[in-house]
Amino acid sequence: PALSLAAEQGHVIVPATGRALRAIPEQVMALPFLRYAITINGAKVSDARTGETLLRAELALDTCLRLMDFAGRYDAMYDCYWNDTGWVDRAFLERVRYYNADEEVVTLLRRTRAPVEDLKAFVRANGQPVQKVQLCFRDMAERETARAEITAAFPDVLVTSSFRNNLELNAVDADKGRALLALARHLGIPVEDTVAFGDSSNDLRMLRAAGTSVAMGNAAPEVRAVCDYVTDTNDRDGVAAFLRTHILHGVSL
């Protein structure tokens, strides 16, 4: 109800996610007031109603292949987004539980990844830029080692994460903040009138870019540190709580 009421008052509601458009839950995209989406960590901004792409920022093919080669030094599975679909080596998908202890993550990956026999060969044969590369780690210390090493070795790659054991690798100019600013310009909305909600490191640039930034109650400490407000958790409808208190009742931000 809070989202619907906000939309009725003229606010534009936009999901901003690391997922591709088709991987956003159906019950979200079925909301009648949703038109625009920021997806794949800002690699793409879409008009879901017309199918128009408003912004695109992708990894060069050579960079993607080098990232996959680099990932081979870690005990990690990797996949990629190309053409708005997640692709993964079949062998990795068959061992998805080895790399992911969280059953929700296992279910998500199985639902949203298309298996191929050899992902690198598949990407090379397509010969096109890739939207994102993702790594999932069994060992969290190794994840932090990989974060530092990839950041140092690939200055043209932005390294973020959205759940406990992953790293998400995008083009350095693909981030939710740049996407938010581009969409605001497209819609003629002053940036100071934008509000962003987030809980993970892939939300940081968006939260810094927005006129008002709100951390979810379950947000990582580095996310809370950059935000103007902290609301309740995802599971306790923190977005709705903030909207009711600060937006629907006309409280000045």
Task: Show where each model-derived region lies.
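Mg2+-dependent phosphoryl-transfer enzymes with acidic/Ser/Thr/Gly-rich catalytic loops
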Residues: 152, 167-253
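Conserved acidic, metal-coordinating active-site core of Asp-based
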Residues: 70, 74-77, 81-197
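Short, well-ordered alpha-helical microsegments
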Residues: 21-25, 143, 177, 203-204
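Active-site phosphate-binding/coordination module
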Residues: 1-103
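Short active-site oxyanion
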Residues: 10-14, 33-35, 132, 192-193, ...
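Short, acidic loop-to-helix structural element flanking the phosphoryl-transfer center
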Residues: 1-11, 56-63, 115-120, 171-185, ...
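Short, structured coil segments at secondary-structure junctions
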Residues: 32-33, 40-41, 49, 153-155, ...
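Alpha-helix termination/capping residues and helix-transition junctions
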Residues: 30-31, 127, 188, 224
